[in-house]
Amino acid sequence: MSNEDILVPAALSTHQDESDFTFQKFDSDSMERSFYLGPLSSQDELWDKLMQYYSIDKLIAYLQRNPEYVQITLQFPDTLVKDSSFIIRALQDKLDGDGAGRKFWALADTAYSACCVDEVAAEHVKGDLVIHFGDACLNAIQKLPVVYDFGKPFLDTDVLLACFTEEFKDKDQKICLMSNASYTHHIPDLYSRLKSNGYTNVVYSVVNTGLLTETAEIIDNTTPLSDTDELFTLGNRVLMGARQEEDIDEETLRNEYALFHITMPHDPHLLYLTTVFESIHTYDVADQVISNGPYPSLTRRYKNMHKARTAGCIGILVNTLSIRGTRETVNKLIKLIRENGKKHYLFVVGKPNVPKLANFEPVDIWCILGCGQSGIIVDEFGEFYKPIITPYELTLALNFEVTWTGKWIIDFQKAITEIDNSLAELGIDDSKHGNDSDHDLDAPEFDAVTGKYVSSSRPLRALNHLQLDAPSNEDKQVMARVNGGTVIKGTVSTAVEHLANRAWTGLGSDYKDDEGYEEDGATVEEGISGIARGYEFDQEDAARKSQNQSQ
């Protein structure tokens, strides 16, 4: 090929040098696995450790016992997706010869929380089984069977014990050992070593298998020690230890027990744990250090709960579609919001962030429905433009008498119970329609945060008292203002009221100030036809340029 044949890309309008593209380069093509596999010396050792980490032999045995599963989806978190090709290869090598005709699909990008089973993504390929790898919340899903493979990560227990004894010098202190689902594999051994070192008041946690449905199973799950008993159930964990004279309950944990957690929990789960234990100590397995905070606080949650009391428009943000009970929770929330005279909008958003939620300015506050382990947004630094609360906090806010208990309930079933109690307080049940309570919805309300009077906290309460005139045939006005709201074609709209009060209402809103403005709308004209490279005026311009060049 000659130099004339080499195609050179067009020069950009702005100068770019090598430094502009350094973010796309990597110093090494090796993938970092040592923090969960341990030190590696060769490629053969990598293969063996991956086989042990994922318990591939036991996973293969499960699939051989269940040949009815053909379309198998493998779900990975971001930290483990690099191992997906290895796992699929190992499964295919062992299972291709049995004649079942299995197909494997890697779900590399989950729509919602990584700890939840992405049932929606699995249904896209008509999967009949989901194998979930890594940490898991064990929330019950709607339909598909699921197999959990937590993995067995490497942990230098000698270094951990040294850090532990330095942090907890009092061997009589009451301590609870906990970790994410993957590192639970090390918890019983750590408990035994601490007991042998003289720590007398230590309890440990294991995965609560009672949450599993009949179509769910855990591969190579950790079994409790034979000389320990169940002491207390805490969500998706069961606390184990030597039988004590006094039973452990929530009050005992909150007032007497320190939590030692291997790995840093996600913010929602961490906030929940701060309301359960007297103190929190987290161990970073990568840096091998213990941290004592700062951690998320309920103080901001209390403030946002009071903001929800005077919010006129509530956005219900659904951050999960797989967890059982989501639809029931949404329906009961909508009923509770309506009975309190407030407006609501329903949004289903995968991985919500600041730009996504900023698009909906009329929303005064967000109520998020998501996994309690990692699917709830805890906006600790005020990055979002509007506050974000949970269904339980919204239920507290819409009660006529606010009672702040200091608890943080994130379980759907418990939240549904609280909503039912609030509806009962309003005099409403599933067989009734309307508000039969004696509470005065027209009573003035004041913002507990600012102390100011709020007139728009119940925008729909005036619907029963609003009298509207039927529009005449000659009336071309779409929007009408009346006492109590803004009306579009006979329907009260809080969104239009919000838009009308803005200084700038969108592109074209100032056309009425231009000459030739048509009140009935723009005149319909014939537009351009054809394809973009062959518009008629483009052809005429090209012919004109060609003629000028020939002259």
UniProtKB/Swiss-Prot annotation:
Similarity annotation: Belongs to the DPH1/DPH2 family. DPH2 subfamily.
Protein name: 2-(3-amino-3-carboxypropyl)histidine synthase subunit 2
Keyword RNA-binding in record: no
InterPro entries on file: DHP2, DPH1/DPH2, DPH1/DPH2_1, DPH1/DPH2_3
Gene: DPH2
Biological process terms in GO annotation: protein histidyl modification to diphthamide
Pathway entry: Protein modification; peptidyl-diphthamide biosynthesis
GO CC annotations, alphabetized: 2-(3-amino-3-carboxypropyl)histidine synthase complex; cytoplasm
Keywords associated with the record: Cytoplasm, Iron, Iron-sulfur, Metal-binding
Oligomeric and partner information: Component of the 2-(3-amino-3-carboxypropyl)histidine synthase complex composed of DPH1, DPH2, DPH3 and a NADH-dependent reductase, predominantly CBR1.
Function as written in the Swiss-Prot or TrEMBL entry: Required for the first step of diphthamide biosynthesis, a post-translational modification of histidine which occurs in elongation factor 2. DPH1 and DPH2 transfer a 3-amino-3-carboxypropyl (ACP) group from S-adenosyl-L-methionine (SAM) to a histidine residue, the reaction is assisted by a reduction system comprising DPH3 and a NADH-dependent reductase, predominantly CBR1. Facilitates the reduction of the catalytic iron-sulfur cluster found in the DPH1 subunit.
Disulfide bonds: none
Positions of [4Fe-4S] cluster binding: 116, 137, 371
GO molecular function list: 2-(3-amino-3-carboxypropyl)histidine synthase activity; 4 iron, 4 sulfur cluster binding; metal ion binding
